[in-house]
Design a protein with these regions (language model features):
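Membrane-interfacial helix termini and adjacent extracytoplasmic/periplasmic loops
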Residues: 1-41, 75, 111-115
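Residues that define the loop-to-transmembrane-helix transition and helix capping
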Residues: 33-34, 64, 75, 87, ...
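Hydrophobic/aromatic positions within or immediately flanking transmembrane alpha-helices
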Residues: 36-37, 51, 78, 137
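Membrane-embedded alpha-helical segments of multi-pass transporters/permeases
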Residues: 48, 109, 148-152
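C-terminal transmembrane helix and the adjacent membrane-cytosol boundary/short C-terminal tail
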Residues: 53-68, 135-163
C-alpha cells in the first residue's frame, strides 16, 4: 500500500521530482506496467539477493587473486571466474523469484489497475469475478506448465552434472 502513496499523481515521487526541478507536471505512474515492475522488483529483490550473496560469500577469494596474478583484468575476472562460480546462486535466485512472480496478483491489482495482465491476475479474475471455470482451469494448466518445465530442465541438467 505504501507504493500507492509514492507512485500516485500527487505522490511522494512526483512531489520530489517537481521540487528538484526534473519535471514540470506530475507523471502518471500508477495503473501502468512501470508501477507493477517497480512493485515486483521491490518485493522480490531480496529473494534474488540472498542466494546470490550466500553463494558469493562461499567463493574462494584465492581464485580471484590467482586470476589477477596471471594478468587477468578485473572485468574479465568477473566474467570468467566470478559469474561461472556464482551460477548456482543465480539459478536458485531466479527460481525463488520466478515461481512466486508467475502467480502474483496482488501487486498487479493494486499498482497496475484493471489494464495490467499477468497470468496470476487473469487466473484470479476468471475464477472469482467472471466465474468462468473452464478458462480459469486452462490458465492454471498453462501456469503449471510454465512453472514445471524450467524446473524439469534444471533437474535434468543437475543429474547430468552429477553423473
Amino acid at each position: 500500500y505504501a507504493w500507492i502513496g509514492i507512485l500516485k499523481t500527487e505522490g511522494l515521487l512526483n512531489l520530489a521530482l517537481i521540487s528538484i526541478g526534473i519535471i514540470d507536471k506530475p507523471l502518471t505512474i500508477m495503473n501502468t506496467d512501470l508501477a507493477v515492475y517497480i512493485g515486483i522488483v521491490y518485493s522480490y529483490l531480496p529473494f534474488m539477493i540472498l542466494p546470490l550473496y550466500a553463494n558469493l560469500e562461499k567463493m574462494d577469494m584465492s581464485l580471484l587473486e590467482a586470476a589477477a596474478d596471471l594478468g587477468c583484468r578485473p572485468l574479465k575476472t568477473f566474467w570468467t571466474v566470478t559469474i561461472p562460480l556464482s551460477l548456482p546462486g543465480i539459478l536458485a535466485g531466479c527460481f525463488l523469484v520466478f515461481i512466486p512472480v508467475m502467480g502474483e496478483f496482488v501487486i498487479p491489482d493494486l499498482l497496475g489497475g484493471t489494464n495490467t495482465l499477468m497470468i496470476g491476475k487473469v487466473l484470479w479474475t476468471e475464477f472469482f469475478y467472471n466465474r468462468d471455470w473452464p478458462v480459469a482451469s486452462a490458465v492454471a494448466i498453462i501456469l503449471l506448465a510454465l512453472l514445471v518445465v524450467p524446473i524439469m530442465f534444471y533437474q535434468k541438467s543437475q543429474e547430468k552434472a552429477i553423473s
